[in-house]
Amino acid sequence: STYGYLIIPFYYRGQLRYYNARNVIGKGPRYNNPDKDITGLGKQFIIFNHDALEMYRSVFICEGALNALTIGDRAIATMGKAISQYQVNELLKSQCQRYIILLDPDARSYAVNLALKLVAYKKVKVVFLPEGFDVNDLGKKQTLKLVYQTRYQSYQELIQIRNSLE
């Protein structure tokens, strides 16, 4: 049953591919999501708001759909901190030129590792959110303030950041 759940549809080129069911009343599991999309592929093949990759030159990468919705049309979600090779390939082959990575604070090393996979081909900026806060907690205005205070990073800078996290 999806009673008490907010349903967030995932479209790809105008076609419904997947959905998130997020509990908003507190009873039952936090999420009630399907294991696969309508084509039978698992969530590692899904990007929320995938179409933004072809529409914008700068795109924000978040973990969850609600975080992406907080940022707006230019944000995508990867369905978690562990980003699949398929998702990385989609980011690399897109028309987008700049990525702003906004993963949750517990995923800092994942964010830097994603940036390292992209930086040879795209401009990347890893924005570290304050401990205990995701994009949704901070809101759009505070998140964008952090984004504007962070500059794009080079491969060497990302290596230094990764080493400092270990």
List where the protein language model places each region.
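TOPRIM fold recognition
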Residues: P29, Y56-V59, N67-E166
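Phosphate-handling DNA/RNA-contact segment within nucleic-acid enzymes
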Residues: S1-Q97
